[in-house]
Curated annotation (Swiss-Prot):
Physiological role: Type I interferon cytokine that plays a key role in the innate immune response to infection, developing tumors and other inflammatory stimuli. Signals via binding to high-affinity (IFNAR2) and low-affinity (IFNAR1) heterodimeric receptor, activating the canonical Jak-STAT signaling pathway resulting in transcriptional activation or repression of interferon-regulated genes that encode the effectors of the interferon response, such as antiviral proteins, regulators of cell proliferation and differentiation, and immunoregulatory proteins.
In-chain residues carrying the UniProt-annotated modification Phosphotyrosine: Y24
PANTHER family found in the cross-reference section: INTERFERON BETA (PTHR11691:SF73), TYPE I INTERFERON (PTHR11691)
Glycosylation sites (chain numbering): N46, N101, N131, N136
InterPro entries in UniProt: 4_helix_cytokine-like_core (IPR009079), Interferon_alpha/beta/delta (IPR000471)
Quaternary structure and interacting proteins, as annotated: Monomer.
Annotated protein name in UniProt: Interferon beta
Subcellular locations according to the entry: Secreted
Keywords: Antiviral defense, Cytokine, Disulfide bond, Glycoprotein, Phosphoprotein, Secreted, Signal
GO MF assignments: cytokine activity; type I interferon receptor binding
Signal peptide: 1-21
Record carries keyword Manganese: no
Cysteine pairs bridged by disulfides in the record: C52-C161
């Protein structure tokens, strides 16, 4: 799996380092591939427990994320980047209590890190080439959403059940990420 991931990253770096303008279809394809890789890694981590049902919580995904078709493509890239960044930050925290395979967590973090670095480069390019303005309300709501997740983990002292709940929530995030990347390909 690691070899496949490295080959995929190398090919994508070749595609994007020579590009001077954003190809949204190609970017959408690449993001979908990366998101699927992350989902696969997250599924491999799963050790759900019915005993954790009492710990479930509604973290309240921002409405604007649920309705991604309202974004401009540049805004969608900004939101996707923020989501990858926050997911990376969450899984960079102490996962030792989970019993998860450390290699799988490291592969997840590597994929997320590469993706967010790549998106930041593309966002810089967009900002340079286009007269792009953005309403910060969506990003603020998104940051508050992820802050609720982090506070939940801290309040539950990073317990196995807390991580189980957060794991399920992050998997749900990839549903929204898929919709955003599909939007880029249209």
């Amino acid at each position: 799996m690691t070899g496949r991931c490295i080959l995929q990253i190398a090919l994508l770096v070749c595609f994007f380092t020579t590009a001077h303008s954003v190809s949204y279809k190609l970017l959408g394809f690449q993001l979908r591939s990366s998101s699927l890789e992350c989902q696969e890694l997250l599924v491999n981590l799963n050790r759900t427990s019915k005993y954790c049902l009492k710990d479930r919580m509604n973290f309240e995904v921002p409405e604007e994320i649920k309705k991604s078709q309202r974004f401009q493509k540049e805004e969608a890239i900004l939101v996707i980047n923020e989501m990858f960044q926050k997911i990376f930050n969450i899984f960079s925290r102490s996962t030792s209590s989970t019993g998860w395979n450390e290699t799988t967590v490291e592969n997840l973090l590597a994929t997320l890190h590469w993706q967010k670095e790549h998106l930041e480069t593309i966002l810089e390019e967009i900002m340079e080439e286009e007269n792009f303005t953005w309403d910060n309300t969506t990003l603020l709501n998104l940051k508050k959403y992820y802050l609720r997740i982090v506070r939940y983990l801290k309040a539950k002292e990073y317990s196995v059940c807390a991580w189980t709940v957060v794991h399920a929530e992050i998997l749900r995030n990839f549903f929204f990420l898929e919709r955003l990347t599909d939007y880029l390909q249209n």
